[in-house]
Design a protein with these regions (language model features):
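Carbohydrate-active enzyme catalytic cores, enriched for enzymes
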Residues: 85, 123-295
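Aromatic-lined, polymer-binding surfaces characteristic
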Residues: 1-170, 177-178
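Replace the tail clause
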Residues: 32, 36, 245, 326
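General N-terminal targeting signals
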Residues: 46, 50, 109-112, 134, ...
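Catalytic core of carbohydrate-active enzymes
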Residues: 266-343
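Glycine-centered flexibility sites
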Residues: 76-77, 115, 252, 292, ...
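Sparse, context-dependent recognition of short Cys/His-centered cofactor- or disulfide-binding micro-motifs
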Residues: 14, 18, 63-66, 70, ...
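Short, charged N-terminal helix-start/capping segments
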Residues: 37-70, 189, 196-219, 291, ...
Length: 343
């Protein structure tokens, strides 16, 4: 990675990811690096991560203070790298860490008040995982995390995620949903933090499914091992079997089910607005499953590459944006009550 001159100036998400990997490798393998290797890694972080990040504008639509997953990923990755080289470059590292502590709350506020995440299941896992990595890195270094785990709805978000799972093994795939990995290590962290055996059991069941399809394993699966811990509970805080659950906020959502078994009924429906990162014209839509069949579904994301090839304005969420001419993002692709063809 050091040999690559540019880690992603024009797609800063790549720099956030690279910074995380380099920071972990530098810190965890510190005694294995030679003096020259350490210096090369430090210089790459300073030049290709920190210096580049200082050129990012902080205005509208920027990830710097954005309310979407890029904020968590970029600040999280950069801060892990900063903590790794803190002893050598304390001033440079301090700037990155304090900036993250100031900016990440803009993303953390989208969980208010009950934990629902506007960007959907896929980007919940992505953004939330990086915020948790930032929290854990800060705790390890400083003994605190600037209160980044205390924002309203952030810890409750574990229930939101578990309620997205239907009874037949499918998720409620609203917004730009990518059906991805079976396991989500961040749920093991929530289980540990909340003392929730139901969350832990849910993640363990997902890991067991990997025996049948190992290609669906999360690239961060080693955190399942690091965040697992024995949980003793009397069951009083177990919520995974709730038959009704709802969340207010930027994207209100609700779920009901007759039970959690395969043949039982499950319905999920959402409100909110398409005018948000990865949004679809799906406000008021629903999904429904019963007798082991999902009768009403959400198709999830359209291929970004196909949308770019069609020259659609992929990240424009205005009413008349060409983004909505793609079928999967449009009202036509969702289960909506409509009047005169308008949602």
């Amino acid at each position: 990675l050091n040999a690559i001159e540019d880690w992603g100036t024009y797609h800063f998400l790549d720099i956030g990811e690279a910074a995380l990997g380099v920071g972990i490798a530098y810190d965890w393998l510190y005694d294995e690096w030679t003096k020259d290797e350490k210096k090369a890694i430090e210089e790459s972080v300073l030049k290709k991560c920190f210096a580049t990040s200082k050129k990012v504008f902080a205005g509208k639509d920027s990830w710097m203070k954005g309310d979407f997953n890029w904020n968590q990923v970029c600040h999280g990755g950069l801060s892990v790298a900063a903590l790794a080289i803190y002893n050598t470059y304390p001033e440079e590292a301090k700037f990155i860490i304090e900036r993250a502590a100031e900016c990440v709350p803009y993303a953390a506020k989208v969980y208010e008040p009950d934990g629902a995440y506007p960007e959907g299941a896929s980007y919940w896992e992505y953004g939330t995982t990086f915020q948790v990595l930032l929290i854990e890195a800060m705790r390890s270094a400083f003994g605190h995390c600037y209160g980044l785990n205390e924002y309203e709805g952030f810890m409750e978000s574990a229930d939101f995620r578990i309620q997205l799972n239907g009874n037949i093994g499918l998720e409620y795939g609203y917004s730009d949903y990518h059906r991805g990995y079976y396991n989500e290590p961040v749920m093991m962290w929530y289980a540990k933090e909340l003392g929730r055996s139901d969350l832990q059991q849910n993640e363990l069941e997902k890991i067991e499914r990997l025996l049948d399809n190992p290609t669906k394993i999360s690239r961060l699966s080693f955190f399942d091992l690091l965040w697992w811990s024995p949980i003793k509970t009397d069951g009083s805080n177990v919520k995974g079997n709730l038959r009704c659950w709802q969340a207010n906020g930027k994207m209100p959502i609700a779920f009901m089910r007759t039970d959690r078994y395969h043949n039982h009924a499950y319905v999920g429906f959402k409100g909110g607005t398409p005018y948000h990162s990865h949004g679809h014209q799906d406000s008021g839509s629903f999904i429904y499953e019963s007798q082991g069949v999902r009768w009403a579904l959400d198709l999830g994301t359209e291929s970004y590459d196909k949308m770019r090839k069609a020259q659609l304005d992929l990240w424009n969420y205005e009413q008349n944006s060409s983004r909505w001419t793609a079928f999967r993002t449009s009202a036509e692709a969702h289960n909506l009550a409509r009047i005169d063809s308008d949602p």
